[in-house]
């Protein structure tokens, strides 16, 4: 959804959100990156009084389903803060892991910004019915299984997703709330 339409959804509470690494580069390729994204999602959800119903962190993008506990959602503010905070720490992780070639590709000299980790903006889809939430959860959980990714054989095998929480009752690094508590 384009930014100009977000004001129409100010009083909606549940969204499927996608944000992507700049140029679709595969940045998230080791546990420190996944841990950073997981802990950052937890912090942002707590700061904006929201709960995460599902997620997947892929090598070059992430999806999550979020529900806000306030009358007005703060999705744009949450995403701004999440991307700003993670950008700084992702850059540090890239430097520490010696990924100078990738850092060169991410170089970006505009104003005070030296590297561009995330693409501008994000995509969001309002989820108003249980069936739609279930469709998006299925999509999230099957994303790592797609032939072009081949990151897992079964949804619950991929550790950076809510699939283990839903299918195997496994604890997740991202603090999750079961969608049936709301739908």
What spans do the regions from the language model cover?
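Short catalytic/metal-binding and nucleic-acid-binding patches
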Residues: 1-183
